């Protein structure tokens, strides 16, 4: 396998740039650059030179022999000055060395997976953690990247193995005419594990956390949707005009309130009729956004919004109007009245829609595998042929193996590690 290298720190210019090298030629590359290799896992100052002996930079270098490191292979880290020219010169020199090449996106992490340093669930958690933008996302995804989810699944797998051992024992000590019954405790254990998996299947998934709670602003034209949208974003993201129908498309913006992620969605004004084909497309898109919404803020006439929509009286600063009799909130985007209360209510509602801080969450792929395992356990019944019971347990165990990557496909791995940046 070729030795790979890449810049693992932020894009230059920066105070420090960290270049990683991983593979069998890592030690030789360090020796060629620095003239000597320092003691393992001890930082040392070295002058780096190119193949002609010209100085590239003075850097702190680390020699990290495998397998007890990030990738499980021999590794080197070069902590150099973070200027563009310095980084480019060092990478250019590395590229001329036999057996070395630039790393592909996610290739360091993929090698860590291949060498057993992390499992698939940890890799998926790390991929999501790299794109975490809010505190809640960081807390939940850190738990998955740190191995808590893998420990949990490993425990479930061990329980299935123990159940399989009981079935195999019963098969070994039975004859063709008199198959021994499994103990009642066996079925209790199966039911308990199935219920535990079922509880996990009810929890919010990572995708919901990644995208945030979808909040749609809906109502007729000129109801104040875009004004409220801008007020919550604290920016002029949407055009606001007294002309009805100014907003003709769906406008989405991510935002975090107190570390909780949301996606705010402004929509075209809803009304019947109209000969403008572009406006009709905007209305159709608005209705589609309503179908996918977690929360709808209804700024139209009271009682005319979708079921479970929040009735918002968004023009509390205007005297000549027909006020809603029982709105959830009265507010004014112009004066700021009620905006803080709306944000508090949104955050409170999000607690039931998103994983809680410190929780472990699964993604759609992992959810499907847990569902498969739970379904197999649910098929196990008293009096069932023991060979059928054994097959249900084997399939459940296979689902757990695919969860952590004991069994997987190259296409799925390509898709996962392709999400990483170069150098990770």
From Swiss-Prot:
MF annotations from Gene Ontology: GTP binding; GTPase activity; metal ion binding
Keyword Nucleotide-binding found: yes
EC class of the enzyme, as a word: hydrolase
Ligand binding (GTP): 222-227, 241-247, 266-269
Location(s) in or outside the cell: Cytoplasm
Family from the record: Belongs to the TRAFAC class TrmE-Era-EngA-EngB-Septin-like GTPase superfamily. TrmE GTPase family.
Residues annotated to bind Mg(2+): 226, 247
SUPFAM superfamilies (UniProt xref): P-loop containing nucleoside triphosphate hydrolases (SSF52540), TrmE connector domain (SSF116878)
Superkingdom of the organism of origin: Bacteria
One of the GO BP terms on file: tRNA wobble uridine modification
Residues involved in K(+) binding: 222, 241, 243, 246
Record-listed (6S)-5-formyl-5,6,7,8-tetrahydrofolate binding positions: 20, 77, 117, 424
InterPro entries with a match to the protein in the record: G_TrmE (IPR031168), GTP-bd (IPR006073), GTP-bd_TrmE_N (IPR018948), GTPase_MnmE (IPR004520), MnmE_dom2 (IPR027368), MnmE_helical (IPR025867), P-loop_NTPase (IPR027417), Small_GTP-bd (IPR005225)
Name of the protein in its database record: tRNA modification GTPase MnmE
PANTHER family registered for this protein in UniProt: TRNA MODIFICATION GTPASE GTPBP3 (PTHR42714), TRNA MODIFICATION GTPASE GTPBP3, MITOCHONDRIAL (PTHR42714:SF2)
Chain's gene name: mnmE
Ranges of residues in domain TrmE-type G: 212-351
GO cellular component, one term: cytoplasm
Quaternary assembly: Homodimer. Heterotetramer of two MnmE and two MnmG subunits.
Cofactor binding mode and count: Binds 1 potassium ion per subunit.
Alphabetical UniProt keywords: Cytoplasm, GTP-binding, Hydrolase, Magnesium, Metal-binding, Nucleotide-binding, Potassium, tRNA processing
Cofactor(s) listed: K(+)
Purpose of the protein: Exhibits a very high intrinsic GTPase hydrolysis rate. Involved in the addition of a carboxymethylaminomethyl (cmnm) group at the wobble position (U34) of certain tRNAs, forming tRNA-cmnm(5)s(2)U34.
E.C. designation(s): 3.6.-.-
